[in-house]
């Protein structure tokens, strides 16, 4: 624990805790402070002026990161017939219907994204208690309940990131890897922030996007000036 504390203190050196950095400078700092022996994920957190306990203040959506996420995303698809063939052709890792239901019910959940055709949602609905808490339940609002399974699989594999506001009014997501060049990370962050801005609910009052910070998996958080991220 002492070594971990020393590493964290060292990483925070040179950071001004109360300063709001321009996004370009913030990303340079995040990359320079990443010291783990693996390719850390660059993460964004956004504090929103919403209370998600109210239905008209829920924030949820999906963002297609222009430069991908750097993650290997495993995709499961509930589909039959030609749509199942489309899913396999698009690169889905596991495809099925009742057979896939049995696999998931048996506790084997080896996927990061779950897609379903609308006709199979009554079947998938039986898995609500399993998939729901893991954030894997297909939802038409984020494009994972669709007849275009080929497009949905391609999006998931290509860097589509789902987001949903948490109880404290915070959204966080991985937006790339520290190995990405700075400009690609900035482009991803701006695209993600823009998607969250466009998902502003009707019940939101006052300042919607209040605070933004970026960090790496093991690094310190860097506060960001929102105006340098938001395009509108």
From Swiss-Prot:
Keywords on record: Repressor, Ribonucleoprotein, Ribosomal protein, RNA-binding, rRNA-binding, Translation regulation, tRNA-binding
Keyword Ribonucleoprotein: yes
Entries under SUPFAM superfamilies matching the protein: Ribosomal protein L1 (SSF56808)
InterPro entries xrefs: Ribosom_uL1_bac-type, Ribosomal_uL1, Ribosomal_uL1-like, Ribosomal_uL1/biogenesis, Ribosomal_uL1_3-a/b-sand, Ribosomal_uL1_CS
A Gene Ontology BP annotation from the UniProt entry: regulation of translation
Listed PROSITE patterns: RIBOSOMAL_L1
GO molecular function per UniProt: rRNA binding; structural constituent of ribosome; tRNA binding
Cellular component annotations (GO), alphabetically ordered: cytosolic large ribosomal subunit
PANTHER family the record matches: 54S RIBOSOMAL PROTEIN L1, MITOCHONDRIAL, LARGE RIBOSOMAL SUBUNIT PROTEIN UL1M
Sequence similarity: Belongs to the universal ribosomal protein uL1 family.
HAMAP family cross-referenced by the UniProt entry: Ribosomal_uL1_B
Subunit structure: Part of the 50S ribosomal subunit.
Task performed by this protein: Binds directly to 23S rRNA. The L1 stalk is quite mobile in the ribosome, and is involved in E site tRNA release.
Descriptive protein name: Large ribosomal subunit protein uL1
Annotated source species: Methylorubrum extorquens (strain PA1)
């Amino acid at each position: 624990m002492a070594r971990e504390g020393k590493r964290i203190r060292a990483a925070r050196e040179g950071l001004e805790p109360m300063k709001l950095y321009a996004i370009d400078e913030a990303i340079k700092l995040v990359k320079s402070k990443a010291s783990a022996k693996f390719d850390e994920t660059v993460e964004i957190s956004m504090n929103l002026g919403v209370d998600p306990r109210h239905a008209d203040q829920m924030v949820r959506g999906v963002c297609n990161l222009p430069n991908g996420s750097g993650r290997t995303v495993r995709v499961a698809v509930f589909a039959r017939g030609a749509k199942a063939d489309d899913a396999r052709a698009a690169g889905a890792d596991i495809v099925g219907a009742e057979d896939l239901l049995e696999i998931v019910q048996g506790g084997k959940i080896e996927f990061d994204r779950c897609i379903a055709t609308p006709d199979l949602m009554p079947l998938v609905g039986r898995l609500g208690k399993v998939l729901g808490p893991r954030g894997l339940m297909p939802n038409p609002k984020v494009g994972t309940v669709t007849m275009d399974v080929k497009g949905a699989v391609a999006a998931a594999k290509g860097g589509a990131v789902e987001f949903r506001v948490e109880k404290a009014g915070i959204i966080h997501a991985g937006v790339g890897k520290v190995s990405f060049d700075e400009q690609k990370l900035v482009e991803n962050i701006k695209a993600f922030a823009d998607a969250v801005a466009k998902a502003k609910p009707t019940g939101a009052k006052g300042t919607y996007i209040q605070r933004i910070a970026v960090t790496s998996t093991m690094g310190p958080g860097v506060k960001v000036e929102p105006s340098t991220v938001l395009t509108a």
